[in-house]
Amino acid sequence: MSLKSVALIENWPVPTAAAGVVRADGTVLGTHGPVGRRFPLASVTKPLAAYAALVAYEEGAIELDEPAGPPGATVRHLLAHTSGLAFDEHRTTAPPGERRLYSNAGFEQLGDHIAKATDIPFAEYARQAVLEPLGMADTTLDGSPAKDGVSTVEDLLRFAAEVQAPRLLDPRTVAAAMTVQHPGTKGVLPGYGHQNPNDWGLGFEIRDAKSPHWTGASSSPRTFGHFGQSGTFLWIDPDARVACVALTDRAFGPWAAEAWPPFTDAVLAEV
């Protein structure tokens, strides 16, 4: 089986795009474009960083509810964007747990916390904990664990298969990560405005009933993943039992809000 829908990226107004679709067992259902090319991930870095944090949790290096970040916040708050930290500044704008304030600063403080707990620089810890075991040789998380990752469609398909059928983590840990943290919390979904609630798991955004949204109209409410400002996304739809990755070299904007949902709907209609 080779999906024809992935070729729809040819219609996107971008210089370069690559995409792929994968099942939980690692079966790649279709790819299109330069899937071995390395693209800046922007915020698609966050799911990789979050997965490394969950490995650190299972190894006993950190606890989800231990203090981390600003006063009163925990590792869980940082992963779920409820620490109260501002978007790109290391200052608080709300008490922990009160609002879903999407925060790059929160993931940077999370990386610092894990580096201190493990005595390993976070990028190296992530390489040892996640990238190397999954064979993601073309992926790096140097710089900010919120936004500076670089990867390929091929590598991210390996990661998406892992999240669907975990080998590095207990499946119960992954299930908890895809469960809404601090239910009912409202906030802004970058690029899509205010959402009430703005549901999030541990490092992964959860679609639920959000509208508008970057996934498709036919995406199940349980769909989770992330998109990045560099024109990238990764989603996993547990009901469809499939995951999709798309990477481009054009920044997110109205073109993406228009092109991505029908692309996702076409993929889901074909699997």
What is the predicted role of each segment?
Residues 2-41, 80, 205, 233-237, ...:
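A short, well-structured edge-of-sheet supersecondary motif
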Residues 21-23, 64-68, 139, 201-206, ...:
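Glycosyltransferase-associated regions of secretory-pathway enzymes
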Residues 31-33, 67, 228, 248:
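Short clusters of small/polar residues that mark proteolytic maturation junctions
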Residues 33-36, 93-96, 107, 141-145:
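Flexible glycine/proline-enriched surface loops and loop-helix/loop-strand junctions
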Residues 40-44, 48, 56-92, 102, ...:
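Active-site helix/loop module of the DD-peptidase/beta-lactamase fold
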Residues 47-51, 106-113, 147-169, 176, ...:
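Active-site-proximal alpha-helical segments within enzyme catalytic domains
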Residues 147, 153, 179-239:
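Active-site Gly/Thr loop motif
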Residues 223-271:
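Structured C-terminal helix/loop/strand segments within mature extracytoplasmic catalytic/sensor domains
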